[in-house]
Curated annotation (Swiss-Prot):
Lineage: Eukaryota, Metazoa, Ecdysozoa, Arthropoda, Hexapoda
InterPro entries registered for this protein in UniProt: DNA/RNA_non-sp_Endonuclease_sf, Endo_G_ENPP1-like_dom, His-Me_finger_sf, Non-specific_endonuclease
Glycosylation sites: 268
Alphabetic keyword roster: Endonuclease, Glycoprotein, Hydrolase, Nuclease, Secreted, Signal
Top-rank taxon, per record: Eukaryota
Keyword hit for Nuclease: yes
Coiled-coil spans in chain: none
Recorded GO CC terms: extracellular region; mitochondrial inner membrane; nucleus
Protein name stated in the entry: Salivary protein Tsal1
Expression across tissues: Saliva (at protein level).
Annotated organism of origin: Glossina morsitans morsitans
Family: Belongs to the DNA/RNA non-specific endonuclease family.
Cofactor section: a divalent metal cation
GO molecular function, a single term: single-stranded DNA endodeoxyribonuclease activity
Mitochondrion among keywords: no
Length: 399
């Protein structure tokens, strides 16, 4: 099923929103830059009380007269200063207001709105797992979204992949990123505190004492495991959307030097291409295979905790970028291992980086995560967790 993040375009078309002769507008980041900005939703039509998440069409999104916005402070104990959890604004005489002269800028929540993960009936990973939507709850019965979704393994308590949209027309106007603590919303056997402890360097040194890769300690002061986002906050525009990516269900352990190195570069060049083309890219990000290390003379698969199959550490981080409009795509694989110097055998497809005009010399630097490029058809039989019904006939090129 196609990710439902086209909601903004659908809503704007339904309401007849265009860039000319509009009566009201929202400008980003100005309209959403306060970290306590409420979730903004657009009423689908005046004939229904259904809403879609606001999806900007650029730096400025225009709306016609009588467009209705719903602002909501989602999450526990969250509300406006007047005690209400939601408020409706109507476009009238070139301004959005609540009928009493109060505009969007006067409504901030007591804290950043939070999202929740909702299990759907949609299957993923060859039908073995379920898709979880990341949504905002605006009432006991009503959910709005998703912001992105996750194919989640509730048995090993980890994501198979996360899927998000890069909105090339608007993402460069996003609210700046800020470091945020992780939360744990789906796991049954560990808490947020447990996860935070797993990512403490001193705990990792103790956990992996005696583990080596190519004769080097698995973990040291420079190379250690960090919580690496799959759907990145850098692809999200509003504070609430960004906060939703800091859930452990959207995280896999990645070497910090790799996550801050070539994983970061892949995210950046993909986002830049979407901006340059003013395109919407559908992006799947996940881990592939398990990292191994030598321990007591034996090669072992690696897990952050001593409990096997929980908090597994992937050997590769992949990012599958789909440009549906042009029937094009590319799959990046980054080796989650800054220790290995001999990368022979690392690639399992014909490397298409040069053909795709991805010419960053850093991709060959193993200390930042050796990175190569594949066509979808070359690797779909390897990465079986991804939807096998996706058909891509062209290589996505970065020029």
């Amino acid at each position: 099923m196609a990710l439902k993040l086209v909601y903004g375009v659908f809503t704007l078309a339904l309401l007849g929103i265009s860039s000319v002769n509009a009566d009201c507008s929202l400008k980003i980041p100005e309209s959403v830059e306060n970290e306590k900005t409420p979730v903004i939703m657009v009423r689908k039509s005046l004939k229904t009380f259904e809403y879609d998440l606001f999806q900007p069409t650029g730096e400025v999104t225009n709306f016609p007269e009588r467009t209705e916005l719903l602002l909501a402070c989602t999450g526990a104990q969250n509300y406006f200063k007047n005690g209400e959890e939601s408020v409706t604004l109507m476009c009238h005489n070139n301004e959005f207001d609540d009928g009493q002269g109060n505009g969007l800028d006067l409504f901030t929540c007591v804290k950043t709105p939070t999202a929740e993960l909702r299990k759907t009936k949609e299957r993923c990973s060859l039908g073995d797992l379920y898709v979880y939507d990341v949504v905002f709850r605006i009432s006991e019965e009503e959910l709005v979204g998703p912001v992105y979704d996750i194919c989640y393994n509730e048995y090993s308590q980890k994501p198979a992949y996360s899927r998000n949209i890069i909105n090339g027309a608007a993402v460069n106007y996003r609210v700046p990123e800020s470091e945020t603590d992780l939360t744990v919303s789906l796991a049954k056997d560990f808490t947020t505190r447990d996860v935070n402890n797993y990512f403490k360097l001193e705990n990792q040194k103790q956990r992996f004492q005696g583990y080596t890769i190519d004769g080097k300690p698995l973990v040291d002061d420079k190379n250690f495991f960090a919580p690496g986002q799959l759907a990145p906050d850098t692809s999200m525009i509003t504070p609430a959307d960004k906060l939703s990516t800091y859930d452990y269900a959207n995280i896999v352990p990645q070497y910090k030097t790799v996550y801050d190195g070539n994983v970061w570069r892949v995210e950046n060049i993909t986002r830049d291409l979407a901006v340059n083309r003013q395109a919407k890219f559908e992006v799947y990000t996940g881990g592939y295979e398990r990292l191994t290390a030598l321990h007591n003379g034996k090669e072992e698969e690696i897990f952050l905790s001593a409990k096997k199959y929980v908090h597994e550490i992937p050997k590769y981080i992949y990012k599958f970028v789909v440009d549906k409009e042009n029937d094009a795509g590319i799959v990046f694989f980054t080796l989650n291992n800054p220790h290995v110097k001999n990368v022979k055998g690392t690639e399992f497809c014909k490397n298409q980086c040069e053909e795709a005009n991805v010419l960053d010399s850093n991709f060959k630097d193993w200390t930042q995560g050796y990175t190569f490029c594949c066509t979808w058809n070359n690797v779909k039989d390897y990465v079986r967790a991804l939807p096998q019904d996706i058909e891509i006939n062209n290589l996505l090129k970065f020029n």
